[in-house]
Amino acid sequence: MSGTRPAARRTNLTAAQNVVRSVDAEERIAWVSKALCRTTDPDELFVRGAAQRKAAVICRHCPVMQECAADALDNKVEFGVWGGMTERQRRALLKQHPEVVSWSDYLEKRKRRTGTAG
């Protein structure tokens, strides 16, 4: 071994990709600021097992529950309660619907179809 590290991998983002990323970040900041859990101790949301169901109660009346769920599903977040869903519930949805490209779109269509938020 030469003792040298390989060069860091560069990412070639186009201007359009940078704009999309900044728009996504701005949209995320906007909904996160409305989340009911924003002042909650994170330890209450990052629990294991049956305690997750109790933690999900915090989400029930949250105005951005759908955005939160979509963000967690799009980013395949493995831990914690997000958008009123436990880790197990998110894994099940991801497994049942591997074809979904945008969970935001999917959840919005489902909401319109069923007339519910979840």
UniProtKB/Swiss-Prot annotation:
It comes from the Bacteria. Disruption phenotype: During aerobic growth in culture grows more slowly over the whole life cycle, a 2X reduced ratio of NAD(+)/NADH (reflects redox metabolism) and a 1.5X reduction in membrane potential. Has increased resistance to oxidative stress. Enhanced growth in uninduced and activated macrophages, as well as enhanced growth at reduced O(2) tension. However reduced survival in guinea pig spleen but not lungs following aerosol infection. A number of genes are induced, including whiB4, whiB6, genes involved in antioxidant systems, redox factor PQQ and several members of the PE-PPE family. Signal peptide: none annotated. Binds 1 [4Fe-4S] cluster per subunit. The cluster responds to both O(2) and NO. Following nitrosylation of the [4Fe-4S] cluster binds 1 [4Fe-8(NO)] cluster per subunit. GO terms for molecular function: 4 iron, 4 sulfur cluster binding; dinitrosyl-iron complex binding; DNA binding; metal ion binding; protein-disulfide reductase [NAD(P)H] activity. Changing residue 59 to S: Partial loss of the Fe-S center. Complete loss of center and of disulfide reductase. Changing residue 62 to A: Apo-form does not bind DNA. Its cofactor is [4Fe-4S] cluster. Disulfide bonds join 37-68, 59-62. InterPro entries: 4FE4S_WBL (IPR034768), Whib (IPR003482). It is found in: Cytoplasm. [4Fe-4S] cluster binds at residues 37, 59, 62, 68. Residues 36-92 form the 4Fe-4S Wbl-type domain. Belongs to the WhiB family. Homodimer in the presence of reducing agents; the oxidized apo-form makes dimers and trimers while the redeced apo-form does not. Upon over expression in aerobically grown M.smegmatis, apo-WhiB4 forms trimers held together by disulfide bonds. This is Transcriptional regulator WhiB4. It comes from Mycobacterium tuberculosis (strain ATCC 25618 / H37Rv). The gene is whiB4.
